[in-house]
Amino acid sequence: MVKAGCWFIDTFALCYSYRYLVTKHQQQKGLPMQNSQHALTLAQINALTEEQIDKKLRLALDNAIDRIDLTYEQMREVMLLIMTGKCNDARMGAMLTALRMKSESIDEITAAAAVMRELAERIEPANPERLVDIVGTGGDGANLFNVSTASALVAATAGVKVAKHGNRSVSGKSGSSDVLAQAGVKLDLSHDETLACLEQQNLGFLFAPNHHPAMRHAMPVRRALG
């Protein structure tokens, strides 16, 4: 079975810095820069008609099936349509599977990550430049133990402030929230409570449903794809 649909959910935190690295690579090599200046804004996406939405999603899916990489702008628009509930489950599953089968490009991954950042509910730590973000390895198919949670605990104990992103398990035996819940950790904290844990205990758990509410539109498909 093709393991599709998890890359843009379980690796988004890693992608935050990925765009920076790609930009540096393009500058060093003299390559053309991708940007979102021609992509639709969230307000424009919300104003699209059903016919316009269908046309955009159909073109993107046809390209992915033909193994043609989507541009940064095109992937951004597709991701906004997914995250605002304007892409039905059947088309979303087909899109994610087609992207996985052709192998996602740098611009596709970074565009998806950018949209997740745009729609995220954030916390504002006092010294964000001294903050470490550890995200899980869910969806990798390796069936590992919960490496990211163990790493977060070790780093926090060593004095590093860690913002640990995580969710319930999809592909493995236990996701980060499953492990922490069994240990008695309260997951449904307010943003202020999470920030207090981060500042006072060096570790704040950013439970995905609390900080990425737009992901509710993609979760049923994610679970179905495995």
Which residues make up each language-model segment?
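Phosphate/diphosphate-binding glycine-rich loops and adjacent basic-rich segments that engage nucleotide
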Residues: E193-G226
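A glycine-rich phosphate/pyrophosphate-binding beta-strand-loop-alpha-helix module
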Residues: L96, F145-E199
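Acidic, glycine/proline-rich low-complexity segments that act as flexible tails and inter-domain linkers
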Residues: Q34-N143, A158, V162
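Acidic, glycine-rich active-site loops and adjacent beta-strand->loop/helix elements
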Residues: G136-G141, G166-G172, H211
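Short, Lys/Arg-enriched N-terminal segments with co-localized hydrophobic residues
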Residues: T11-P32
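N-terminal cationic leader/targeting segments used for protein routing and processing
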Residues: A4, H25, K29-G30, S36, ...
